Amino acid sequence: PREILEMPPYGCVNVHASLLPKYRGAAPIQWAVIEGEKVSGVTTMRMDEGLDTGDMIMKEEVVLDPKETGGSLFEKLSRIGAALCVKTLAAIEAGTAVYTPQDHSQATKVGLIHKQFGLIDWKKPAREIECLIRGLNPWPSAYTKLHGKTLKIWDADVADGDSQKEAGAVAEVTRDAVFVQTGEGLLKLKEVQLEGKRRMACDAFLRGYSLKDTDQLGE
């Protein structure tokens, strides 16, 4: 309520883990990775009655690594956010803070991520699936089904080529990797975790599990 927000002499300040007005709402860190963003960051703002709609005070950007995960970006933005909060409060106290209204026409909103969101749709392009895997690492994790059991996929790369097989089909099995056909291109699985087992590199997984190029993921 407005009366609560107006109680403190300097108003209320919030730290949001995105470059507002993009990614308002819940789980902005994971969504930035899932959406394949190259840059993310932290914004401090003066709170108003909307959801992440208040005037911006300070921003700091960070360039995402090609293999950035939701977990690694969380760690980066946590450190940046803590320092930016201190700087913001100091500027407010000194009377030097600048309040910049958000361009609401450029706003994007994201929602909560639930465990079921991690179920991989193999009809999607390999690049989208690879981003999903990174964004949901470590929680709730991306997963598929293999012979009726849950198979979590912790790390994967987009691979060259196309097997022309059905989406989700195992296209090739090598000594240390599994190549899966997607709706667009191949995905190379590098680290997996079968239901009831520990997380392991694909070469270790293949030493204990017989996977053939006639198998289908998602079943």
What residue ranges belong to the model's regions?
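A residue-level structural signature of the nucleotidyltransferase/glycosyltransferase Rossmann-like core
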Residues: 12, 54-57, 121, 150, ...
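Generic detector of leucine side chains in alpha-helical contexts
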Residues: 5, 19-20, 51, 64, ...
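N-terminal start-of-chain detector that recognizes signal peptides
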Residues: 16-18, 29-31, 91-94, 114-117, ...
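Donor/substrate-binding cores of folate-linked one-carbon enzymes
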Residues: 1-109, 114-116
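An anion-binding loop in the catalytic cleft
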Residues: 123-219
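Alpha-helix N-cap/helix-start motif
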Residues: 22-26, 122, 198
